[in-house]
A protein has these predicted regions:
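Hydrophobic face of alpha-helices
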Residues: 41-44, 222, 266, 382
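Charged (often Lys/Glu-rich) extended helix/loop segments that serve as interaction or gating elements
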Residues: 268, 277, 282-430
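Active-site loop/helix belt of alpha/beta enzymes
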Residues: 2-3, 159-308, 371, 400, ...
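Active-site beta-loop-alpha junctions enriched in small/polar residues
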Residues: 64-70, 89-90, 110-112, 131-133, ...
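Short acidic, glycine/serine/threonine-rich loops at helix termini
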Residues: 73-74, 97, 117-122, 139-142, ...
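Flexible loop/turn segments at secondary-structure boundaries
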Residues: 69-72, 93-94, 113, 160-162, ...
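Structural preference for beta-strand elements that scaffold enzyme active sites
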Residues: 60-62, 81-83, 102-106, 127, ...
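A charged N-terminal "starter" segment
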Residues: 1-151, 187, 191, 195-200, ...
Length: 430
């Protein structure tokens, strides 16, 4: 099986986090998002322990909210001692409404509105991660009006190609995010920020991309970022104390994907950071990273019911399910690979394209999936590793209600997000 929280009973029925998924589908309906809470907590603890073991005082992993944002997720993050990053006032509101400590929240985004800035300042969040000149000036004005000094990091682009999907590659010079080190724009913004009396520039942020497997990507990022910290000290006399390398560690979506030893990677990264800062005479910074996918992806599974099977002789076979791009748009966006299991049959395998119910030819969950040849209407299919960027990217296209999110623990099963109703679909209509 793809992950050790997935198994089969002696009768061949698929289990997830120890539970029979066919029974979960029967009780809660489909499509259905399942989340293994124990796995989420274990992934948090893995990061937290590695940070305690290898990085300096105050260093902290921040959960990247965009991976999966709902109130119970923030409660778990708070209980485990994580920080979080948010990229909108909506994510910030959700975190605060769940009781997440404001001082452990970092507000990202390349186009924060005046309302975003005012809301974050009014709530006393820990840091804004400033992206551009206009934001710096607007945030200075907002902080001055509130008579506070707001801590910030400055987002810069180090010019690193992580060799991942183009749509999730964010650290190259021409990225829409941050200011480029190579062009001198990052240094200009550092100098501007240091002149603004109501902003307290504490450090730098960068993020090179998502689903990163290469061993040297973060070391190459440090090759840019640490000398840039040294250049800032040389040109301004200021030693910035925080360095945030963003997120991006890859996860296994298929058997072909590498299984990354994240604690070992973090130990190597910490050693390299120590070596580079000592070489340039800099103190070891307070270190931050922003894991999202590697916290929640393998804690998720989505269940579907097959609605029809269509065979086109000489061409292909389709298994159409009761969800699709509305609950998982990632294949439609960038052809993301997934592992799909039949939940309760194990006969002779045939190749099917698993497709959704939306009125789009591109509504594909996964092409070329090997399923039992007798797959038919009413069968349950399970898509693995859907904990990240499925619920959070879901939509109501074709007026389809979004699925429930059901949390699984060793002692209980509970809904974290209820299934939407038709009344919800029209609840905002006038």
């Amino acid at each position: 099986m793809l992950s050790n929280n997935i198994d089969r009973t002696p009768e061949g029925v698929l289990t997830f986090a120890g539970y029979d998924v066919t029974q979960l589908a029967k009780e809660y309906g489909t499509p259905l998002y399942l989340m293994d809470e124990a796995r989420i907590r274990a992934n948090c603890r893995m990061y937290l322990q590695a940070f305690r073991d290898h990085f300096g005082p105050g260093s902290l992993p921040l959960y990247a909210s965009k991976a999966a944002s709902f109130k119970q997720m923030y409660r778990i993050m708070a209980e485990e001692g994580m920080g979080v990053d948010v990229v909108s006032s909506g994510e910030l509101y959700t975190a605060l409404s769940a009781g997440f400590p404001a001082e452990r929240i970092y507000f990202h985004g390349n186009c924060k509105t005046d309302a975003d800035l005012a809301y974050g300042v009014s709530q006393g969040i820990g840091f804004f991660v400033a992206d551009n000149r206009e934001e710096l000036l607007a945030l200075e004005k907002t902080a001055a009006e509130a008579n506070v000094t707001q801590k910030i990091l400055l987002r810069v682009t180090p010019g690193i190609d992580p060799h991942t999907y183009e749509a999730v590659s964010t650290g190259k010079v021409d990225s829409k995010f941050g200011a480029a080190v190579e062009t001198g724009q990052a240094m200009e913004l550092v100098k501007l920020a240091l002149t603004l009396p109501h902003l307290d520039l504490r450090g730098l942020h960068c993020h090179v991309g998502s689903q990163v497997f290469g061993e040297g990507v973060y070391q190459r990022t440090l090759d840019i970022m640490v000398p840039f910290l040294a250049s800032i000290r040389e040109e301004t006399g200021v030693t910035l104390s925080n360095l945030n390398l963003g997120g991006g560690y890859g996860v296994r979506y298929t058997a072909e994907d590498e299984a990354i030893d994240i604690p070992a990677r973090l130990a190597e990264l910490a050693a390299y950071l120590k070596e580079e800062t000592e070489r340039l005479g800099l103190p070891m910074p307070r270190f931050l990273m922003e894991p999202g996918r590697s916290i929640v992806a393998d804690a998720g599974m989505t269940l579907y019911t097959v609605g029809s099977v269509k065979r086109i002789p000489g061409y292909k076979q389709y298994a159409a399910v009761d969800g699709g791009m509305t609950d998982n748009p990632r294949y439609a966006l960038y052809q993301s690979r997934y592992t799909v299991y039949h939940a309760h049959k194990s006969g002779s395998l045939e190749r099917f394209d698993v497709v959704g119910r939306c009125c789009e030819s591109g509504d594909i969950i996964q092409p070329g999936v090997e399923l039992p040849g007798d797959t038919c209407r009413g069968d349950i299919l399970a898509v693995c590793t859907t904990g990240a960027y499925n619920y959070s990217m879901a939509s109501n296209y074709n007026r389809l209600p979004r699925p429930a999110v059901v949390m699984l623990t060793p002692s209980r099963i509970y809904e974290a997000v209820r299934r939407e109703t038709f009344a919800d679909l029209t609840g905002l209509d006038l």
